[in-house]
Design a protein with these regions (language model features):
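Nucleotide-activated sugar donor-binding and catalytic core shared by glycosyltransferases
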Residues: 1-120, 126-251
């Protein structure tokens, strides 16, 4: 058994749920642990795991093939001339009041900054859809769309100004594209991005999300500091490294 993305930890089984439990359980049975970073490797070592290989993250490999310089889309045409913000919010632990706080913070920004447009590829969960409809209504500078295919999603990220998310993978994808990320969670299994300065944990309180969102729109120095920070997730050769390690082990 090979575990790709091994060693990501929050050590809180409720956040993210159920991913944190699944990751810890998989590491117990894995014969090969492919850790994306040194921090992930150290987590595994503390747990007594062996056969650990730091390879970087395979999502960086994917970005090399999905992101296109000449990519276009009607929604991107709609957003031209504006600061395009990508919003992703779906975590089950954020359903209810935390997600309402997120949406209200975004709404306040839309009311205050006329040059901002937001695209929200919305989760299929009817509770998420109901809340989004209630908070955002028919705002002309908010596009709530169906989930995007990975090629489209990566290119939307690439052409955005910044990202607000409670997702996991976006925390690796966006920094690789030079995009600041506000993580609307209280914990993250990707502390490397926070340490590097590409991610900022802003929690789920409306005022804190709003304040940090506004700062990146108004303070160019702060924006550039986050967008130009180093990418800690590898050089895009993770897949090749993993294959070579497995082939060597089977020889």
């Amino acid at each position: 058994v090979g575990h790709v993305e091994a060693g990501l930890r929050t050590y809180n089984l409720q956040s993210p749920y159920p991913e944190e439990f699944n990751r810890q359980a998989t590491s117990i049975v894995a014969d090969y642990n492919f850790a994306p970073t040194q921090v992930s490797k150290e987590n595994l070592q503390k747990e007594g795991r062996t056969n650990i290989f730091v390879t970087g993250n395979t999502v960086i490999d994917a970005l090399k093939t999905t992101v296109q310089e000449d990519y276009d889309h009607p929604i991107l045409e709609w957003a031209k001339g504006s600061k395009l913000i990508m919003l992703t919010a779906h975590r089950r632990e954020n359903l209810g009041e935390p997600m309402e706080h997120m949406f209200r913070a975004v709404n306040r920004i839309l009311e205050e900054f006329e040059d901002v447009k937001v695209v929200y590829p919305i989760h299929k969960n009817p509770k998420v859809r109901e809340l989004a409809s209630k908070i955002f209504g028919e705002n002309e500078r908010m596009k709530i769309i169906e989930p995007l295919e990975v090629i489209d999603f990566h290119n939307f990220l690439n052409q955005s100004y910044m990202i607000l998310t409670d997702s996991g993978g976006v925390q690796e994808e966006a920094p690789s594209l030079g995009k600041p990320v506000l993580v609307m969670r209280d914990t993250t299994e990707r502390p490397e991005g926070v340490a590097a300065g590409t991610l900022k944990l802003v929690g789920t309180e409306e005022e804190n999300i709003y304040r940090n969102f506004k700062l990146l729109l108004e303070d160019q120095d702060e924006y550039e500091k986050m967008s130009q920070a180093s990418n800690p997730y590898g050089d895009g050769t993770a897949c090749q490294q993993i294959v070579e390690i497995i082939m060597k082990g089977l020889a």
